[in-house]
Amino acid sequence: MKTLLLTLVVVTIVCLDLGYTRRCFITPDVRSERCPPGQEVCYTKTWCDGFCSSRGKRVDLGCAATCPTPKKKGIDIICCSKDNCNTFPKWP
């Protein structure tokens, strides 16, 4: 009986853990959402466009399987792997 109970507890823990997905902030709404399966990294990408001097840097928040790499100079990407760790940056 104890073996059966222990087996049920282990199976329950394994099943609950397999269903977990990361939560990250997502733009454009800056809402916390569950990431698709396999995407366990949250990222914050910032860059300047033509309005950078008046509006500040553009911001993109999202989920990824691995930390994205910048394709151009001037793009900053910060990655993290905790729920909702990619908050909108605070500007001075």
Swiss-Prot record:
Disulphide-bonded residues: C24-C42, C35-C63, C48-C52, C67-C79, C80-C85
Signal sequence bounds? 1-21
Q: Which InterPro entries does UniProt cross-reference here?
A: Snake_3FTx, Snake_toxin-like_sf, Snake_toxin_con_site, Toxin_cobra-type
Provide the tissue specificity: Expressed by the venom gland.
A GO term from the CC aspect: extracellular region
Q: Which UniProt keywords apply?
A: Acetylcholine receptor inhibiting toxin, Disulfide bond, Ion channel impairing toxin, Neurotoxin, Postsynaptic neurotoxin, Secreted, Signal, Toxin
One Pfam family linked to the record: Toxin_cobra-type
Tell me, in one coarse class, where this protein mainly resides.
secreted
CDD domains, per database record? TFP_snake_toxin (cd00206)
Molecular function (Gene Ontology), one example: ion channel regulator activity
Subcellular locations according to the entry: Secreted
What's the stated role of this polypeptide?
A: Binds with high affinity to muscular (alpha-1/CHRNA1) and neuronal (alpha-7/CHRNA7) nicotinic acetylcholine receptor (nAChR) and inhibits acetylcholine from binding to the receptor, thereby impairing neuromuscular and neuronal transmission.
Q: Which family does it belong to?
A: Belongs to the three-finger toxin family. Long-chain subfamily. Type II alpha-neurotoxin sub-subfamily.
The protein's name in its UniProt record: Long neurotoxin 2
What organism is the protein native to?
Answer: Oxyuranus microlepidotus (Inland taipan)
